[in-house]
Amino acid sequence: MSDEPVIQIRNLTKTYRDFWGRKKVQALNSLTLDVKKGEVFGLLGPNGSGKTTTMKLLLGLLFPTEGEISILGKPASDVSKNERIGYLPEESYLYRFLNAEETLDFYGRLFDITAEERKQRTNELIEMVGLQHARRRQLKEYSKGMTRRIGLAQALINNPDLVLLDEPTSGLDPEGSQDMKRLINDLRDKGKTVVMCSHLLADVQDVCDRIAILYGGELKELGRVEDLLKEQHETQFVTSHLGDEAVDEIK
């Protein structure tokens, strides 16, 4: 991990307005933070805290009401930056009649990747996400976990420097969640910068180097997970653990 910032956010505010231009919802309020090169950074907060809005602002899908964003050395409004970004939305909107190979080839074409490189990247990514056995099955036959994995492979087809993951473990069973976390750790090992958002502390605790806690569109805490858990903060962390007897009973 380097101290070089890949993302710089300064006083970012996003206000949604109604048809008449009246203030309806303030999704973000004066958010300021940096994401360092090579780290896995987590945005943690409940639904409606501003996590997905932040993701969309980074991608340039939304425009801020106030504030500035620099991403990979360019403003968020510069679409050329997207060539170096991979994005996994909370719901993977993929063509269900295509198989895994066809899906990755299709998205590779959108990035103008050559046929030879598309084939190589497709094979590498299918192996990376563990879908060799299902590479020629239509996506409509995939489980939720398999769909998330091919969605991650799609996000990596352009070999991005920055990967944005919106609720990557959403809807996954414990085994699927562990597989996704392993893949995120693999991305860190390869030098990728990852920003993921989640409403689950366990998700960010297992993989993130640092986290930002959002609530009501405002930044409440920022730092390493272990430091935030040890120190006294305004934000309270409530965790629960099942005892061995309870686990045995569930089994």
List PLM regions with ranges.
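A short, flexible loop at the N-terminus of ABC-type nucleotide-binding domains that lies
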Residues: 2-9, 15-30
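Conserved catalytic motifs of ABC-family nucleotide-binding domains
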Residues: 159
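Conserved ABC transporter NBD signature motif
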Residues: 67-83
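Catalytic Walker B motif of ABC-type/P-loop ATPase nucleotide-binding domains
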Residues: 163-167
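ABC ATPase "signature
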Residues: 222-223
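Conserved ABC ATPase "signature" region
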Residues: 105, 109, 116-134
